[in-house]
Structures are given as C-alpha cells and as structure tokens.
Amino acid sequence: MKKRILITLLAAISVTSLLPAAVRTVPGASAATAAASIKFANGVYLGAVKNGLPHGKGKLTWSNNKWYMGDFVQGKRSGAGKYYNEYISEDGRTHRTVYNGAWKNDQMSGTGTLTDKVTEPTGEVVSNAITTGEFGSNVWKSGYQVMHAVADPDYSFMYKGNGTTISIWGTNGSLLQQWKEGNLFRVQYQKGQVYKEYWIFPTETAAEEKAKQASIRYLKNIASQAAPHLAKFEQLAKQVPLK
C-alpha cells in the first residue's frame, strides 16, 4: 500500500516542460514580474511572469481537478505551494492526492504534508493516508506516516528520523498502553544496529519465542522514548477517517 502511494504521487505530479504557447500580459503590470496568463499545451498559468516564464506567485491549472498554486522560479515550482490532483483509475476508483509544502525544481523538497485518499465508485473510502515531515526529490525522507485502510489490521504507522525507524501495524487508540503490554499486532523497531520485531501470532519454535519475548522486553523498556511518536501517530490518525 505504501509503495502504491509513492507510485501514485510520482505519476500524479510529473509535469512536462513549461513551454508557453501564448502569453497575455495583464495591463499595468511591471515588465520585470508582469502578471500574465500563459497557455501551455496541457494547461493554463495565471500569475507573475519573468522573461516569459512563471516566476513568483501563480496558479498552474491542468484541469478542474488538477492544479498547483504557489511559488514559481524560472518556470518551475519552487518555494511554497499546494498541489491537488483528483482522477479516476482504470479500476473505477477515485484517487485524490494533495501535497502542501516546499518545492524545488518541480519536485517536493523540504517540509510538507502529503495526503492520499482512494474511494470506490460506491462512495466507500478504502484507504486514507497522511505523510508529514521532510521530502527530497519527491521522496519522503523523515517524519510520520499514518495509513487507515479497509484491511486487517486497519492502521499502519511509521516514523523515520534521527537514525530511528518505528513501524507499527494494528488498531488506533491506546498505542502506548499496547506498547507497554507487548500486544500490538506487529512492531518493527530499528535504531542504529539495534533491530527488534514481534508479531502477535504464535511462534513455531522455542528459539523464535525466545527472540520474540526478548524484543517485547526491550521495547517495554524504551516505552518513554516511543511515547512522543505514539502520541503523534494517534493525532494524525484523526485526520484519515474512512469517510
């Protein structure tokens, strides 16, 4: 599911070179950063222009359901801006991808928030995800990700940062208590050379059970370190309802 979000995003935000087909300058605007309307082969730009290219504040619209509004530098999305894309895939599902944050050279780069929501033709929301933190070259680098889906378990959580990665699959609510009790559906924890993992399912061998219990004990002992991240997971989970 997480790979699907990344693939969806990369396909959604890729843009061909901005080669203007026609430029109409707004009367009264300065020549250096004139306000203008520019028609492209695949869309329309309205905003500040310099040397015939979007430069400054503006909005680039490909269709009613696909647009970017924010900063441009020499024809590329750079600075702060919001990207919105809603489309129907071959399976009939509606995908809505929104990124609000920093850009550089037409790519997500810097601090931002990415959301991805998928809805069936019946109106049923089958997945809703939010990813927040630092991005670079259209790739999420660090921060928090929460996904809510029609699945079992229905939530997945991930934190990446400061050399630590925490991944949890389970249900939302009382995450810290579940962490302390060692009864989360699945946990993966890595910090440097330390890696701990356990599933809720029974193990098959005595050695596997021993390793599982060792992981649970270790994770219980670092509950205070995990607590801020678990609280952030629960906070973000409120933003991804299946409705």
Region spans (language model):
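Glycine/tyrosine- and acidic-biased, solvent-exposed loop/turn segments at the edges of beta-strands
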Residues: A21-K243
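Sec-dependent N-terminal signal peptides of Gram-positive bacterial secreted proteins and lipoproteins
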Residues: R4-P20
